[in-house]
C-alpha cells in the first residue's frame, strides 16, 4: 500500500487561512492561541475524519507561523489593499469572512514572502479557493492576486 502526501506548504497555507478565519470569526487577537488551536488540529491526524486511510497530512510549521504572524503584523495594510480592489458597489463590511481570510493570507504571501514565486502563490490560493469558495469568489481571488502580482512587479 503506497502512502500519499500533500505538499507541506500547501497544508500550511490552508491552515493559515483557517487561523485567520478563526481570528475574524471569534474576534480573537491572541495570535499564539489561534496558532496553537490550528496546529493541534493538524498534528492529530485522527481529528481529520474524512481522509483516505493512506493519505498523510503534515504541515510546514515554520511556513504556517510565518504566514499567520505576517498577516497579524500587516493586517491593516492587507485590508486596505483588499478594500481598494473592491468595485464601488461592494461594501467591505459585507465581504464573506472566509473570502477575506483567504485574501489576507494570499496577499500577504504574495507581497511579504519574496522567496515564493507569484505564479505559485496565485495557483496555490486559487486551488484553495476552489475548495472553499463559490465560483464568483474564486474568480475574484484569481483576479485580485493577478493584479497585485503585476503591480508589485512594477514596484520592484
UniProtKB/Swiss-Prot annotation:
Alphabetic keyword roster: RNA-binding, Transcription, Transcription antitermination, Transcription regulation
Where along the sequence do coiled-coil regions lie? none
Key word Transcription present:
yes
GO biological process assignments: DNA-templated transcription termination; transcription antitermination
InterPro entries, alphabetically? NusB-like_sf, NusB_fam, NusB_RsmB_TIM44
Q: Which GO terms describe its cellular component?
A: cytosol
Q: Which CDD domains match?
A: Terminator_NusB
Return one GO MF term. RNA binding
Q: Does the keyword Transcription regulation apply?
A: yes
Query: What does it do?
Result: Involved in transcription antitermination. Required for transcription of ribosomal RNA (rRNA) genes. Binds specifically to the boxA antiterminator sequence of the ribosomal RNA (rrn) operons.
- State the family it belongs to: Belongs to the NusB family.
Task: Write the protein's name.
Answer: Transcription antitermination protein NusB
Q: Which species is this UniProt entry from?
A: Rickettsia peacockii (strain Rustic)
Amino acid at each position: 500500500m503506497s502512502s500519499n502526501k500533500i505538499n507541506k506548504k500547501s497544508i500550511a497555507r490552508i491552515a493559515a487561512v483557517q487561523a485567520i478565519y478563526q481570528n475574524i470569526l471569534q474576534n480573537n487577537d491572541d495570535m499564539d492561541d489561534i496558532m496553537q488551536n490550528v496546529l493541534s488540529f493538524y498534528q492529530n491526524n485522527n481529528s481529520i475524519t474524512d481522509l483516505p486511510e493512506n493519505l498523510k497530512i503534515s504541515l510546514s510549521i515554520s511556513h504556517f507561523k510565518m504566514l499567520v504572524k505576517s498577516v497579524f503584523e500587516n493586517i491593516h495594510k492587507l485590508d486596505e489593499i483588499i478594500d481598494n480592489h473592491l468595485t464601488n458597489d461592494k461594501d467591505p463590511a459585507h465581504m464573506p469572512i472566509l473570502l477575506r481570510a483567504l485574501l489576507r493570507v494570499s496577499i500577504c504571501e504574495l507581497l511579504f514572502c519574496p522567496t515564493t514565486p507569484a505564479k505559485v502563490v496565485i495557483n496555490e490560493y486559487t486551488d484553495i479557493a476552489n475548495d472553499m469558495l463559490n465560483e464568483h469568489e474564486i474568480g475574484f481571488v484569481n483576479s485580485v492576486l493577478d493584479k497585485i502580482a503585476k503591480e508589485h512587479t512594477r514596484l520592484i
